[in-house]
Amino acid sequence: MPTEDRVCFTWEEYARHVREYWRGVAESDGFDSEDIRSPVVLTGLFHYDCQSGRHYPEPLLGTSFELAALLKFNKTMNLTSSYYITLLAHDPSLEKTFQVRVDEREYGSLDLTVAIARPKKDQNEVSDGVFQGPLPDWPSEDALRHDRNRFYELEISEWQATDWISLYLKLLILATDRGMFVQTGLPQVQILEVVIETEEENEKPPDKRLNARRAHVYITFTGLPKSPRLVEIGEHVERKAIIRRVIDASGYLTLLGKFWSGKDTDQQRSMTLPSGEQAESSKKRPRLS
């Protein structure tokens, strides 16, 4: 990792540099930060002889792999640090790069947790298609009504029985503006319609899609008076939210969400979902608990 040795800069420049540094570290999950420039006091990447990796405790990798070399590691600059370790392991014919994160829990004693132990993601791996990259546009009304292999509209009783749908909507509202509801609390929004899109086409019964590891959830609701991300004001205004849920093989849950207020169009965007008109709103309006 390059450093800023013997370079003078103002406090404002330093603070900006610190923010940029930690943003880059966060984007790589703390592992691959060689190309991130940082002031000397923030330098956390150390290059060691790969042979020293033989001293790393092999059980952290599981019984089917043997440690080959320690490639690099990064650490947080605390008394009790987190170590972000990249190492090479094999079984023994197939070599695989691993990422391991070890968190110290107490200074001056043996008390640590292995928070991450995973193969490094191959950049050439086949992507998850529609469940990768930016969120899609809102589907067209025609797709919602007729493309049953792709979309499943939940009955009110179905989404009420799964508290994660209302929970995800609450998280989206609060994440959009955390300070807006400090005094008043979360508004009592009313869900009108929920449509789910998954990889499991023709799943029978269709409600099994609720348990899919990868899903887009399209929610129509009212009751949100205003938001910095929304133009129209008023509790009566029908809002649309798109939320992606991905649970990977290691059990990590990733949520990505946004409000949708774009213009209705019949064109498709990035080979994902066609954008379209508003969904009907003639359903009953149960409140979020």
Curated annotation (Swiss-Prot):
It comes from Arabidopsis thaliana (Mouse-ear cress). Belongs to the UPF0725 (EMB2204) family. Pfam families: protein_MS5 (PF04776). NCBIfam families: A_thl_para_3677. Coiled coil: none annotated. Disulfide bonds: none annotated. Residues 268-279 have a biased composition (Polar residues). Residues 266-289 are annotated as: Disordered. This is UPF0725 protein At1g27860.
